[in-house]
Amino acid sequence: MSQLSLFSAEARPAALTDLAGLLCGPGQIVRFGAGDQARLSIVLADATRAPAVRSACAEAGVGAQAVVTESGTTALRTAFRCDLAELARAWTRGAVKMVPQEWQLDGPTLRLWALTAGAPDGRGGYLLGLDPHAPQTHQALVAATTRVGLPPARIGDALRISGTRRVARLVELVGPPPARLPAGAWPRYRGRAAC
């Protein structure tokens, strides 16, 4: 039996702050009115992930609705909510998405990032997608993944986690694959998914 990491996704119950994982990838958060409400949205590259992402949002206490965009892709969005305003304040400067200073990545947040924007690279590594429309977040996310023990290589609009120890650490942090996730999409270590 392996020891549970204090930073893994299974170390604590889901929390609203875990939704920052959507913002590590292509997610967006916008404030409304006086800034006391915010809406979180994300366009998914893979529509089959929508049920798993909706379930993860619900575990964090936030409902998300699936919609089809004008371009035909699937997006998830929340209602405007007061409890998302603090996340919006932390992750934006004006209308620009920014990673909070000294922000610490953890397992639950990394799990949502992998769920929404992660993919195996076909060579034993794993890619964590970045927001191509927010290049100002990329270097801070490189630093955050490095601080959590996953120093990545930047490959275009993604961070590549590779190497036996790093992939094992990633598998440890994200925990087992969500029930509704398509097969083969979750990080694996030597052919084994997290268990």
Residues covered by each model-derived region:
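Internal intein/HINT superfamily modules and their associated LAGLIDADG
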Residues: M1-C195
